[in-house]
Amino acid sequence: MRIGHGFDVHAFGGEGPIIIGGVRIPYEKGLLAHSDGDVVLHALTDALLGAAALGDIGKLFPDTDPAFKGADSRELLREAWRRIQAKGYALGNVDVTIIAQAPRMLPHIPQMRVFIAEDLGCHMDDVNVKATTTEKLGFTGRGEGIACEAVALLIKATK
């Protein structure tokens, strides 16, 4: 078994909506990013890549490459997952924590879990997503951006 950890953060800027966990969420602000700014899928992709010792999302999909400008993070996750499976790994489970004062994430979490399970070809019971605030402390608490942490457990499927 191998464990990976991922973290991502994006500042608010411009106009919304935002995309979090593959879900389009109405919000007056957008997120500043080279791709679609999906902190959940970026952190999750990093956690999975880390567990497989395949580097990180920036190595695989560099923000200096125009090909990834505005990229759909679900596509990036699926490509990373293909590479991980090619190394002989299967998914144990993933656990994601969104850190944001606003917008409210709870109504969108069930759909995030559906999308992640679809993209990883796993059961929804293998995907947990939760959200918290920082009680108005720090940059997320001041509403300056959104952060996310993710943990992934991989199991060696083949020798």
From Swiss-Prot:
It catalyses: 4-CDP-2-C-methyl-D-erythritol 2-phosphate = 2-C-methyl-D-erythritol 2,4-cyclic diphosphate + CMP. Pathway: Isoprenoid biosynthesis; isopentenyl diphosphate biosynthesis via DXP pathway; isopentenyl diphosphate from 1-deoxy-D-xylulose 5-phosphate: step 4/6. CDD domains: MECDP_synthase (cd00554). Binds 1 divalent metal cation per subunit. 4-CDP-2-C-methyl-D-erythritol 2-phosphate binds at residues 8-10, 34-35, 56-58, 61-65, 100-106, 132-135, 139, 142. Pfam families: YgbB. A divalent metal cation binds at D8, H10, H42. The record marks H34, T133 as: Transition state stabilizer. One of its GO terms (biological process) is isopentenyl diphosphate biosynthetic process, methylerythritol 4-phosphate pathway. Keywords: Isoprene biosynthesis, Lyase, Metal-binding. Its EC number is 4.6.1.12. It comes from the Bacteria. InterPro entries: MECDP_synthase, MECDP_synthase_CS, MECDP_synthase_sf. Gene3D superfamilies: 2-C-methyl-D-erythritol 2,4-cyclodiphosphate synthase (3.30.1330.50). GO terms for molecular function: 2-C-methyl-D-erythritol 2,4-cyclodiphosphate synthase activity; metal ion binding. It is an enzyme of class 4 (lyase). Its cofactor is a divalent metal cation. Belongs to the IspF family. Involved in the biosynthesis of isopentenyl diphosphate (IPP) and dimethylallyl diphosphate (DMAPP), two major building blocks of isoprenoid compounds. Catalyzes the conversion of 4-diphosphocytidyl-2-C-methyl-D-erythritol 2-phosphate (CDP-ME2P) to 2-C-methyl-D-erythritol 2,4-cyclodiphosphate (ME-CPP) with a corresponding release of cytidine 5-monophosphate (CMP). Homotrimer. NCBIfam families: ispF (TIGR00151). HAMAP family: IspF. This is 2-C-methyl-D-erythritol 2,4-cyclodiphosphate synthase. It comes from Escherichia coli O6:K15:H31 (strain 536 / UPEC).
